[in-house]
Protein backbone atom coordinates (compact mmCIF):
# COMPACT_ATOMS: atom_id res chain seq x y z
CA UNK A 1 0.00 0.00 0.00
CA UNK A 2 2.69 2.45 1.07
CA UNK A 3 4.51 2.40 -2.29
CA UNK A 4 1.30 3.35 -4.14
CA UNK A 5 0.46 6.35 -1.96
CA UNK A 6 2.10 9.54 -0.78
CA UNK A 7 2.73 9.65 2.97
CA UNK A 8 -0.18 11.51 4.54
CA UNK A 9 1.35 14.85 5.63
CA UNK A 10 -1.65 15.95 7.72
CA UNK A 11 -2.28 15.75 11.45
CA UNK A 12 -5.43 13.80 12.25
CA UNK A 13 -8.55 15.40 13.70
CA UNK A 14 -8.62 17.62 16.70
CA UNK A 15 -11.15 20.33 17.41
CA UNK A 16 -8.80 23.31 17.05
CA UNK A 17 -7.45 22.12 13.67
CA UNK A 18 -10.98 21.51 12.42
CA UNK A 19 -12.03 25.10 13.12
CA UNK A 20 -10.27 26.12 9.89
CA UNK A 21 -12.78 24.03 7.91
CA UNK A 22 -16.14 23.84 9.70
CA UNK A 23 -17.98 24.82 12.86
CA UNK A 24 -19.22 22.55 15.66
CA UNK A 25 -22.35 21.66 13.66
CA UNK A 26 -20.36 20.56 10.57
CA UNK A 27 -21.17 23.66 8.51
CA UNK A 28 -18.19 24.66 6.36
CA UNK A 29 -16.56 28.00 7.15
CA UNK A 30 -17.09 30.77 4.57
CA UNK A 31 -13.32 30.85 3.98
CA UNK A 32 -13.02 27.14 3.18
CA UNK A 33 -16.20 27.18 1.05
CA UNK A 34 -14.73 30.11 -0.88
CA UNK A 35 -11.49 28.17 -1.52
CA UNK A 36 -13.48 25.20 -2.81
CA UNK A 37 -15.66 27.35 -5.07
CA UNK A 38 -12.67 29.18 -6.53
CA UNK A 39 -10.91 25.89 -7.27
CA UNK A 40 -14.04 24.48 -8.90
CA UNK A 41 -14.16 27.46 -11.28
CA UNK A 42 -10.45 27.23 -12.05
CA UNK A 43 -10.53 23.47 -12.72
CA UNK A 44 -13.66 23.79 -14.86
CA UNK A 45 -11.81 26.14 -17.20
CA UNK A 46 -8.88 23.71 -17.40
CA UNK A 47 -11.24 20.82 -18.00
CA UNK A 48 -13.10 22.59 -20.81
CA UNK A 49 -9.79 23.34 -22.56
CA UNK A 50 -8.66 19.74 -22.12
CA UNK A 51 -11.90 18.24 -23.42
CA UNK A 52 -11.25 19.78 -26.83
CA UNK A 53 -8.83 16.90 -27.44
CA UNK A 54 -10.94 14.14 -25.80
CA UNK A 55 -12.11 11.10 -27.77
CA UNK A 56 -15.22 12.30 -29.65
CA UNK A 57 -16.60 8.73 -29.83
CA UNK A 58 -16.60 8.01 -26.09
CA UNK A 59 -20.11 8.69 -24.82
CA UNK A 60 -19.78 6.81 -21.53
CA UNK A 61 -20.23 8.06 -18.00
CA UNK A 62 -16.90 6.61 -16.91
CA UNK A 63 -14.52 8.30 -19.34
CA UNK A 64 -16.73 10.10 -21.87
CA UNK A 65 -19.35 12.74 -22.57
CA UNK A 66 -22.11 11.37 -20.33
CA UNK A 67 -19.77 11.74 -17.37
CA UNK A 68 -19.22 15.41 -18.13
CA UNK A 69 -22.99 15.84 -18.40
CA UNK A 70 -23.34 14.22 -14.95
CA UNK A 71 -20.84 16.74 -13.56
CA UNK A 72 -22.71 19.74 -14.99
CA UNK A 73 -26.04 18.36 -13.80
CA UNK A 74 -24.52 18.12 -10.32
CA UNK A 75 -23.12 21.67 -10.51
CA UNK A 76 -26.57 22.90 -11.49
CA UNK A 77 -28.04 21.13 -8.45
CA UNK A 78 -25.39 22.65 -6.14
CA UNK A 79 -25.19 26.21 -7.49
CA UNK A 80 -28.53 26.64 -9.29
CA UNK A 81 -26.91 28.29 -12.32
CA UNK A 82 -28.99 27.55 -15.46
CA UNK A 83 -25.84 27.81 -17.59
CA UNK A 84 -24.70 24.51 -16.05
CA UNK A 85 -27.92 22.85 -17.21
CA UNK A 86 -27.24 24.05 -20.76
CA UNK A 87 -23.70 22.66 -20.59
CA UNK A 88 -25.06 19.32 -19.37
CA UNK A 89 -27.53 19.31 -22.25
CA UNK A 90 -24.85 19.90 -24.88
CA UNK A 91 -22.68 17.08 -23.50
CA UNK A 92 -25.51 14.60 -23.16
CA UNK A 93 -26.47 15.23 -26.81
CA UNK A 94 -22.89 14.28 -27.76
CA UNK A 95 -23.14 11.14 -25.65
CA UNK A 96 -26.39 10.06 -27.33
CA UNK A 97 -24.55 10.10 -30.67
CA UNK A 98 -22.11 7.50 -29.32
CA UNK A 99 -24.41 4.70 -28.13
CA UNK A 100 -22.78 1.28 -28.58
CA UNK A 101 -25.86 -1.00 -28.35
CA UNK A 102 -23.62 -3.44 -26.45
CA UNK A 103 -23.15 -2.59 -22.78
CA UNK A 104 -26.20 -1.69 -20.67
CA UNK A 105 -24.71 0.05 -17.63
CA UNK A 106 -24.76 3.61 -16.34
CA UNK A 107 -20.99 4.08 -16.33
CA UNK A 108 -19.75 2.06 -19.29
CA UNK A 109 -22.83 1.47 -21.43
CA UNK A 110 -25.85 3.04 -23.07
CA UNK A 111 -27.92 3.32 -19.88
CA UNK A 112 -25.83 6.26 -18.66
CA UNK A 113 -26.42 8.59 -21.62
CA UNK A 114 -30.12 7.61 -21.78
CA UNK A 115 -30.74 8.06 -18.04
CA UNK A 116 -28.91 11.39 -17.86
CA UNK A 117 -30.70 12.60 -21.01
CA UNK A 118 -34.09 11.64 -19.55
CA UNK A 119 -33.38 13.61 -16.37
CA UNK A 120 -32.08 16.63 -18.28
CA UNK A 121 -35.04 16.73 -20.67
CA UNK A 122 -37.36 16.49 -17.65
CA UNK A 123 -35.60 19.43 -15.96
CA UNK A 124 -35.93 21.39 -19.21
CA UNK A 125 -39.66 20.50 -19.49
CA UNK A 126 -39.12 18.47 -22.67
CA UNK A 127 -41.26 15.60 -21.40
CA UNK A 128 -41.77 13.88 -24.76
CA UNK A 129 -38.00 13.51 -25.27
CA UNK A 130 -37.60 12.38 -21.65
CA UNK A 131 -40.21 9.64 -22.15
CA UNK A 132 -38.47 8.46 -25.34
CA UNK A 133 -35.19 8.06 -23.43
CA UNK A 134 -36.95 6.16 -20.62
CA UNK A 135 -38.57 3.76 -23.10
CA UNK A 136 -35.19 3.07 -24.71
CA UNK A 137 -33.63 2.63 -21.26
CA UNK A 138 -36.20 -0.01 -20.26
CA UNK A 139 -35.68 -1.89 -23.54
CA UNK A 140 -31.92 -2.16 -22.95
CA UNK A 141 -32.61 -5.06 -20.61
CA UNK A 142 -33.25 -7.25 -23.67
CA UNK A 143 -29.81 -6.76 -25.21
CA UNK A 144 -27.84 -9.62 -23.59
CA UNK A 145 -29.22 -12.41 -21.40
CA UNK A 146 -25.64 -13.35 -20.40
CA UNK A 147 -24.72 -9.93 -19.03
CA UNK A 148 -22.53 -10.05 -15.87
CA UNK A 149 -23.78 -8.71 -12.55
CA UNK A 150 -21.22 -6.13 -11.43
CA UNK A 151 -21.28 -2.34 -11.43
CA UNK A 152 -19.22 -1.23 -14.43
CA UNK A 153 -20.51 -3.66 -17.09
CA UNK A 154 -23.30 -5.63 -15.43
CA UNK A 155 -26.83 -5.70 -14.06
CA UNK A 156 -26.05 -3.59 -10.98
CA UNK A 157 -24.80 -0.82 -13.27
CA UNK A 158 -28.10 -1.02 -15.15
CA UNK A 159 -30.11 -0.92 -11.92
CA UNK A 160 -28.28 2.27 -10.90
CA UNK A 161 -29.47 3.95 -14.12
CA UNK A 162 -33.08 2.98 -13.38
CA UNK A 163 -32.90 4.23 -9.79
CA UNK A 164 -31.18 7.43 -10.96
CA UNK A 165 -34.18 8.20 -13.17
CA UNK A 166 -36.76 7.45 -10.47
CA UNK A 167 -34.91 9.52 -7.89
CA UNK A 168 -34.53 12.55 -10.16
CA UNK A 169 -38.14 12.42 -11.36
CA UNK A 170 -39.40 11.95 -7.80
CA UNK A 171 -41.76 9.23 -9.00
CA UNK A 172 -41.73 5.67 -10.30
CA UNK A 173 -40.97 6.28 -13.99
CA UNK A 174 -39.33 2.86 -14.14
CA UNK A 175 -41.79 0.29 -12.75
CA UNK A 176 -40.67 -1.37 -9.52
CA UNK A 177 -41.56 -4.72 -11.11
CA UNK A 178 -38.90 -4.13 -13.80
CA UNK A 179 -36.24 -3.36 -11.17
CA UNK A 180 -37.22 -6.38 -9.06
CA UNK A 181 -37.10 -8.72 -12.05
CA UNK A 182 -33.45 -7.73 -12.64
CA UNK A 183 -32.73 -8.04 -8.93
CA UNK A 184 -34.14 -11.60 -8.97
CA UNK A 185 -31.86 -12.39 -11.92
CA UNK A 186 -28.88 -11.16 -9.89
CA UNK A 187 -29.81 -13.32 -6.88
CA UNK A 188 -30.44 -16.42 -9.02
CA UNK A 189 -27.16 -15.92 -10.90
CA UNK A 190 -25.27 -15.60 -7.60
CA UNK A 191 -26.85 -18.72 -6.11
CA UNK A 192 -26.17 -20.75 -9.26
CA UNK A 193 -22.49 -19.79 -9.45
CA UNK A 194 -21.96 -20.41 -5.72
CA UNK A 195 -23.39 -23.93 -6.04
CA UNK A 196 -21.54 -24.62 -9.28
CA UNK A 197 -18.18 -23.74 -7.68
CA UNK A 198 -18.99 -25.54 -4.40
CA UNK A 199 -18.85 -22.30 -2.42
CA UNK A 200 -22.39 -22.30 -1.02
CA UNK A 201 -21.30 -23.36 2.49
CA UNK A 202 -19.01 -20.30 2.69
CA UNK A 203 -21.03 -17.82 0.66
CA UNK A 204 -24.56 -18.53 -0.65
CA UNK A 205 -23.99 -15.94 -3.39
CA UNK A 206 -20.95 -15.67 -5.65
CA UNK A 207 -20.18 -13.54 -8.68
CA UNK A 208 -17.38 -13.45 -11.23
CA UNK A 209 -16.22 -11.11 -13.94
CA UNK A 210 -13.90 -12.50 -16.63
CA UNK A 211 -13.35 -15.68 -14.58
CA UNK A 212 -12.18 -13.75 -11.51
CA UNK A 213 -13.99 -13.43 -8.20
CA UNK A 214 -13.56 -9.71 -7.65
CA UNK A 215 -14.18 -8.29 -4.17
CA UNK A 216 -14.42 -4.51 -4.63
CA UNK A 217 -17.07 -1.99 -5.58
CA UNK A 218 -16.47 -1.71 -9.34
CA UNK A 219 -16.38 -5.34 -10.50
CA UNK A 220 -17.03 -7.31 -7.39
CA UNK A 221 -18.97 -8.64 -4.47
CA UNK A 222 -18.97 -5.51 -2.30
CA UNK A 223 -20.62 -3.40 -4.99
CA UNK A 224 -23.27 -6.04 -5.70
CA UNK A 225 -24.10 -6.63 -2.02
CA UNK A 226 -24.29 -2.88 -1.35
CA UNK A 227 -27.14 -2.77 -3.88
CA UNK A 228 -28.88 -5.96 -2.79
CA UNK A 229 -29.22 -4.44 0.70
CA UNK A 230 -30.83 -1.24 -0.61
CA UNK A 231 -34.48 -0.74 0.40
CA UNK A 232 -35.28 0.38 -3.16
CA UNK A 233 -34.51 -3.12 -4.48
CA UNK A 234 -37.03 -4.64 -2.05
CA UNK A 235 -35.17 -7.91 -1.46
CA UNK A 236 -37.37 -9.72 1.07
CA UNK A 237 -36.22 -10.27 4.67
CA UNK A 238 -35.87 -14.01 4.18
CA UNK A 239 -33.41 -13.64 1.30
CA UNK A 240 -31.59 -10.75 3.00
CA UNK A 241 -30.84 -13.00 5.98
CA UNK A 242 -30.35 -16.35 4.22
CA UNK A 243 -28.47 -15.20 1.09
CA UNK A 244 -27.13 -11.65 1.36
CA UNK A 245 -26.00 -11.45 5.00
CA UNK A 246 -23.84 -14.63 5.00
CA UNK A 247 -22.34 -13.52 1.68
CA UNK A 248 -21.49 -10.11 3.18
CA UNK A 249 -19.94 -11.92 6.16
CA UNK A 250 -17.81 -13.94 3.74
CA UNK A 251 -16.38 -10.68 2.34
CA UNK A 252 -15.77 -9.44 5.90
CA UNK A 253 -13.62 -12.52 6.58
CA UNK A 254 -11.35 -11.56 3.66
CA UNK A 255 -10.12 -8.49 5.55
CA UNK A 256 -6.35 -8.11 5.80
CA UNK A 257 -4.77 -7.39 9.22
CA UNK A 258 -4.36 -3.78 8.00
CA UNK A 259 -8.14 -3.39 7.65
CA UNK A 260 -7.94 -3.34 3.85
CA UNK A 261 -9.46 -5.90 1.45
CA UNK A 262 -8.06 -7.86 -1.52
CA UNK A 263 -9.05 -7.08 -5.13
CA UNK A 264 -9.86 -10.78 -5.79
CA UNK A 265 -10.56 -13.83 -3.62
CA UNK A 266 -7.20 -15.50 -4.17
CA UNK A 267 -5.06 -12.36 -4.04
CA UNK A 268 -3.00 -12.19 -0.83
CA UNK A 269 -1.22 -8.91 -1.68
CA UNK A 270 -2.36 -5.96 0.40
CA UNK A 271 -1.72 -3.24 -2.19
CA UNK A 272 -4.78 -1.39 -3.49
CA UNK A 273 -6.64 1.34 -1.59
CA UNK A 274 -9.01 2.43 -4.37
CA UNK A 275 -12.76 2.79 -4.71
CA UNK A 276 -12.58 0.14 -7.44
CA UNK A 277 -10.46 -2.31 -5.41
CA UNK A 278 -10.02 -2.22 -1.64
CA UNK A 279 -11.35 -0.53 1.48
CA UNK A 280 -12.66 2.68 -0.18
CA UNK A 281 -15.28 0.62 -2.06
CA UNK A 282 -15.94 -2.12 0.51
CA UNK A 283 -16.83 0.51 3.13
CA UNK A 284 -20.19 1.19 1.42
CA UNK A 285 -21.19 -2.46 1.77
CA UNK A 286 -20.21 -2.39 5.44
CA UNK A 287 -22.15 0.81 6.14
CA UNK A 288 -25.24 -0.60 4.43
CA UNK A 289 -24.90 -3.89 6.33
CA UNK A 290 -24.76 -1.91 9.59
CA UNK A 291 -27.90 0.02 8.62
CA UNK A 292 -29.82 -3.13 7.64
CA UNK A 293 -28.63 -5.71 10.19
CA UNK A 294 -27.76 -3.36 13.10
CA UNK A 295 -24.61 -5.29 14.08
CA UNK A 296 -21.77 -3.23 15.54
CA UNK A 297 -19.02 -5.29 13.88
CA UNK A 298 -19.95 -3.88 10.47
CA UNK A 299 -19.47 -0.35 11.77
CA UNK A 300 -16.13 -1.34 13.36
CA UNK A 301 -14.93 -2.76 10.04
CA UNK A 302 -16.08 0.42 8.24
CA UNK A 303 -14.15 2.56 10.72
CA UNK A 304 -11.09 0.39 10.11
CA UNK A 305 -11.52 1.01 6.36
CA UNK A 306 -11.52 4.75 7.05
CA UNK A 307 -8.28 4.47 9.03
CA UNK A 308 -6.57 2.60 6.18
CA UNK A 309 -7.79 5.23 3.70
CA UNK A 310 -6.55 8.07 5.92
CA UNK A 311 -3.10 6.48 6.04
CA UNK A 312 -2.76 5.21 2.46
CA UNK A 313 -5.43 7.02 0.44
CA UNK A 314 -3.49 9.92 -1.09
CA UNK A 315 -2.74 7.92 -4.19
CA UNK A 316 0.07 8.41 -6.67
CA UNK A 317 -2.48 7.53 -9.38
CA UNK A 318 -4.02 10.98 -8.95
CA UNK A 319 -7.02 12.92 -7.72
CA UNK A 320 -9.89 11.09 -9.42
CA UNK A 321 -12.86 9.01 -8.30
CA UNK A 322 -12.11 5.44 -9.34
CA UNK A 323 -8.56 5.32 -8.03
CA UNK A 324 -7.67 8.71 -6.59
CA UNK A 325 -7.87 11.03 -3.61
CA UNK A 326 -11.37 12.38 -4.41
CA UNK A 327 -12.91 8.91 -4.64
CA UNK A 328 -11.21 7.89 -1.41
CA UNK A 329 -12.48 11.01 0.37
CA UNK A 330 -16.07 9.98 -0.31
CA UNK A 331 -15.58 7.08 2.11
CA UNK A 332 -15.05 9.62 4.91
CA UNK A 333 -18.20 11.51 3.91
CA UNK A 334 -20.23 8.29 3.90
CA UNK A 335 -19.03 7.47 7.42
CA UNK A 336 -19.58 11.06 8.58
CA UNK A 337 -23.16 10.97 7.33
CA UNK A 338 -23.71 7.68 9.16
CA UNK A 339 -22.11 8.63 12.50
CA UNK A 340 -22.01 12.46 12.56
CA UNK A 341 -18.46 12.05 13.90
CA UNK A 342 -16.65 15.26 12.88
CA UNK A 343 -13.36 13.36 12.58
CA UNK A 344 -14.55 11.95 9.26
CA UNK A 345 -15.67 15.32 7.93
CA UNK A 346 -12.25 16.70 8.87
CA UNK A 347 -10.51 13.88 7.00
CA UNK A 348 -12.63 14.56 3.90
CA UNK A 349 -11.71 18.26 4.11
CA UNK A 350 -8.00 17.40 4.33
CA UNK A 351 -8.24 15.18 1.25
CA UNK A 352 -10.04 18.06 -0.46
CA UNK A 353 -7.18 20.32 0.54
CA UNK A 354 -4.83 17.88 -1.19
CA UNK A 355 -7.03 18.19 -4.30
CA UNK A 356 -6.83 21.99 -4.09
CA UNK A 357 -3.16 21.55 -5.08
CA UNK A 358 -4.23 19.58 -8.16
CA UNK A 359 -1.25 18.62 -10.31
CA UNK A 360 1.43 19.70 -7.85
CA UNK A 361 2.29 16.34 -6.25
CA UNK A 362 3.78 14.51 -9.23
CA UNK A 363 0.86 12.09 -9.65
CA UNK A 364 0.50 9.92 -12.73
CA UNK A 365 -1.59 11.49 -15.51
CA UNK A 366 -4.72 9.45 -16.24
CA UNK A 367 -5.43 8.03 -19.70
CA UNK A 368 -8.52 10.28 -19.82
CA UNK A 369 -7.30 13.20 -17.69
CA UNK A 370 -10.52 15.25 -17.78
CA UNK A 371 -13.10 12.48 -17.40
CA UNK A 372 -15.54 11.84 -14.56
CA UNK A 373 -14.09 8.63 -13.18
CA UNK A 374 -10.40 8.88 -14.06
CA UNK A 375 -9.77 12.59 -14.22
CA UNK A 376 -10.49 16.17 -13.33
CA UNK A 377 -14.29 16.11 -13.72
CA UNK A 378 -14.54 13.67 -10.82
CA UNK A 379 -12.41 15.87 -8.58
CA UNK A 380 -14.58 18.89 -9.41
CA UNK A 381 -17.68 16.83 -8.61
CA UNK A 382 -16.23 15.95 -5.18
CA UNK A 383 -15.22 19.53 -4.34
CA UNK A 384 -18.76 20.69 -5.18
CA UNK A 385 -20.29 17.87 -3.12
CA UNK A 386 -18.20 18.84 -0.11
CA UNK A 387 -19.88 22.26 0.00
CA UNK A 388 -22.93 20.52 1.50
CA UNK A 389 -21.39 17.42 3.13
CA UNK A 390 -24.68 15.97 4.39
CA UNK A 391 -25.90 15.59 0.79
CA UNK A 392 -22.65 14.18 -0.61
CA UNK A 393 -22.85 10.84 -2.42
CA UNK A 394 -20.27 9.06 -4.55
CA UNK A 395 -21.47 9.74 -8.12
CA UNK A 396 -22.95 6.96 -10.25
CA UNK A 397 -22.68 4.54 -7.33
CA UNK A 398 -23.96 5.65 -3.94
CA UNK A 399 -27.71 5.75 -3.39
Swiss-Prot record:
Subunit structure: Interacts with the C-terminal of STOM. Interacts with the EPS8 SH3 domain. Interaction with EPS8 is inhibited by glutathione binding.
This protein's name: Glutathione S-transferase LANCL1
Positions bearing N-acetylalanine: 2
PANTHER family found in the cross-reference section: GLUTATHIONE S-TRANSFERASE LANCL1, LANC-LIKE PROTEIN
A Pfam family: LANC_like
Assigned EC number: 2.5.1.18
Catalytic activity, reaction form: RX + glutathione = an S-substituted glutathione + a halide anion + H(+); 1-chloro-2,4-dinitrobenzene + glutathione = 2,4-dinitrophenyl-S-glutathione + chloride + H(+)
Gene: Lancl1
This protein's UniProt keywords: Acetylation, Cell membrane, Cytoplasm, Membrane, Metal-binding, Transferase, Zinc
Amino acid sequence: MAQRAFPNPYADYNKSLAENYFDSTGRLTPEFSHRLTNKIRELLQQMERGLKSADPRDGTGYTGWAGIAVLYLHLHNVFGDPAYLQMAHSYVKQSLNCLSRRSITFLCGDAGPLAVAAVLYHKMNSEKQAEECITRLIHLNKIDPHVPNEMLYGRIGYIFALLFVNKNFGEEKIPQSHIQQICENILTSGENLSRKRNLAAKSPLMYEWYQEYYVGAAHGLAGIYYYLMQPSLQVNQGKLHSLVKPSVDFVCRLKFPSGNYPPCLDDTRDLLVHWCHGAPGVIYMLIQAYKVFKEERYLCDAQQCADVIWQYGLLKKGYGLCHGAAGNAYAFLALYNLTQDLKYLYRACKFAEWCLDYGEHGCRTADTPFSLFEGMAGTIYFLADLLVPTKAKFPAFEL
